[in-house]
Amino acid sequence: MDDLKMLRGLGRELEHEPPGSLVRQRQRLVDAARGRPRKVRLPSRWALVGMVAVVTAALIVVPAVLLRKGDLRPVDQPNPFAAGSGKMLNVLIMGSDARSRGGPARSDTLVLVHLPADRKHVRAVSVPRDSLVRIPACRTAEGKLVSGGTGPINAAFTLGGAPCTQRTIESLTGVRIDSTVTIDFGGFKKMVDALGGVEVTLPKAVTDKRTGLSLPAGRQRLDGTRALAYVRVRHGLGDGSDLSRVERQQRFMASLLRQAKSQQLRNPVRFVRFLAAAAGSVTTHPRLDVPALEAIARSLEKTGADAVTFSTVPVSPSPHDPNRLAWDRDAAAALFAQFKAEN
């Protein structure tokens, strides 16, 4: 099949559930300050990199620390990822639902994280998966050249994996990305189960026929399978929009991290199981080795939770497809300018 033809059809093939209604989407866009990052206060220092990005920090940094038995010894050679190295760091985080039944893999979550050279603050920008964008020609990890076209932004991952997603984000933002981190959703379920489940509190009961998810109102503990359905469902919870789903994911991840930290103190064996599941859930491109991970962890030691900002790419309903979102180019350019120049 021609790559461009495949791309044009991905809008229908990739979405197992339609986007929220245009009315709800418009209302959310009106309610939010366009492009204005909001402060996010996280529950503990363990949650440093803000919401979804926090999970990645835990997944790639904590296993590295464990390999060194918790001793973050300084490396002998200067590391470009360390604070004071004069190097800022941009990391693209993706949540992927790689399919076991032969279907196309998709990137469900996209977050671009910026660590300035002094590591005094962290910026994380979420990219709605309903964004309709131009996907440039790119090469896969195996070196295959795939043609581009216009399509939903998560189609880039289906066409060419992490390299094509990185190329697409770089072309849209003008930001150079140092590393791409992919979190496998199958591993996500194992992580939740390794902790014995994660607690959530629902203001009302949730029933979704598409996923089979059925949850009562109130406080409850979710196992891995139900947790994954909970963070991905769009109907019957919130206003049905992609933006509402992103916020729910963020709250769940913060709860997961609080519980992981608690298990570290109360049940070390269970915590080690969690780390093992986490280590098996993440891949990086280009690969981040242990010294790089240690340097990132050390550089964030003095970064307070109040120094973390989280925002979403400013968008509006696409004039070409009412079920998709178009970026506000000027506002997005101003937002991502912070990723290219130190303040």
Predicted regions span which residues?
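Non-catalytic, solvent-exposed segments at the cell envelope interface
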Residues: 43-47, 61-343
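Core hydrophobic alpha-helical transmembrane segments of single-pass membrane proteins
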Residues: 51-61
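N-terminal export/targeting signals for secretion/compartment entry
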Residues: 1-52
